[in-house]
Design a protein with these regions (language model features):
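Multi-pass alpha-helical transmembrane bundle typical of ion/small-solute transporters
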Residues: 1-331
Length: 331
């Protein structure tokens, strides 16, 4: 298989990954707005997909640069590494989707890419310093989402304390459309940029680009793929995210989405690739805990956290195994 054919395969698989990312993470964008019955599932996925795409015209490419050249030394990257890394990430996403686990597509990509790079060139392939912030934010992003959600919940509770519950419910049913749009913007910019990073790395490795600058067509294609995946949805995970962790009202849904949006947009601004899944889960737990700790179904939360911990090493193992298996096929 020649280099150009491999490049085309990598681009196709990256867009497939972005589609699966939107499909897998659709639940994060719309679980709260569906579970509170503000929108039907069909309208919710259209709403989220639209704002996923609009994010292409709002934010930069700092996260793409972190993924593409900040975690693996770009000079050792070739099409085989990228191909195996993508297949590892897609395989992990598929396994966790079948199991109904809301794991992180972002961390699956990081793990698959890193595992394939190590299989190719050893641990010297990794930019060790580039892994510090993403790994640190595995733990920090849900904590930040949790704290911001508690703060938003407490603040908005104080603002509406003198109004009748039915009136407050009507207000927040409308406001949840805004918060869901903001969250989908944050989801779109943070997650679509990861695919941009991989495609741009492939273009550099294949000699199509002289410097690491993300082409505009790559930005548009990644956002279109993610929007399409979001429209396809991931309904089993929606149930876990929307109701099994804690029961949400429109007021709580607004607080969770607003907290998630603020966290995702802030980290995207600083080029930190975080997990939308981790962020919104932390925010939903924060909403429940602001009422009382017993409102959170901690058994479900522990199962989700366990899946998070396994994502990077699990996807890395798949990426490494697939790289070794593919040596004879793509010489």
């Amino acid at each position: 298989m020649n280099s150009f054919t491999l490049l085309l395969v990598v681009v196709f698989l990256t867009l497939t990954f972005e589609f699966s990312n939107g499909w897998h993470d659709a639940a994060n964008s719309i679980a709260t707005v569906v579970s509170t019955r503000v929108l039907t599932p069909f309208r919710a996925v259209l709403w989220a997909a639209f704002w996923n795409f609009i994010a292409a015209f709002v934010f930069g490419t700092a996260v793409a640069k972190t993924i593409g050249k900040g975690m693996v030394h770009i000079e050792i990257v070739n099409e085989r590494v990228l191909l195996a890394g993508l297949l590892g990430a897609i395989s992990w996403n598929t396994i966790t989707l079948i199991l109904g686990l809301p794991t992180s597509s972002s961390h699956a990509l990081m793990g698959g890419y890193g595992g394939a790079a190590v299989a190719h060139a050893g641990f010297k392939a990794l930019v060790l310093g580039g892994w510090i912030k993403p790994v640190l934010f595995i733990f920090l992003s849900p904590i930040i989402g949790f704290l911001v959600a508690m703060l938003v919940t407490i603040l908005t509770s104080w603002i509406v304390r003198g109004y009748r519950p039915l009136k407050v419910d009507r207000w927040f049913r409308r406001l949840q459309l805004v918060s869901a749009a903001a969250y989908s913007l944050g989801h779109g910019t943070n997650d679509a940029q990861k695919g941009m990073g991989i495609i741009t790395a492939a273009l550099v490795a294949g000699g199509m680009l002289k410097s690491y600058d993300v082409p505009y067509w790559v930005i548009i294609c990644c956002h279109l793929a993610m929007g399409g995946g979001t429209m396809a949805g991931g309904w089993r995970i929606i149930k876990t995210m929307g109701q099994r962790i804690t029961k949400l009202t429109p007021f709580g849904g607004f607080s969770a989405e607003a907290a998630g949006a603020l966290t995702l947009m802030g980290t995207a601004h600083f080029g930190i690739p975080v997990s939308t899944t981790h962020t919104i889960t932390g925010a939903i737990v924060g909403v429940g805990a602001s009422r009382r700790l017993s409102a959170v179904r901690w058994g479900v939360t522990r199962r989700i956290v366990f899946a998070w911990v396994l994502t990077i090493p699990g996807a890395a193992l798949l990426g490494a195994v697939l790289f070794q298996a593919g040596r004879s096929l793509v010489k």
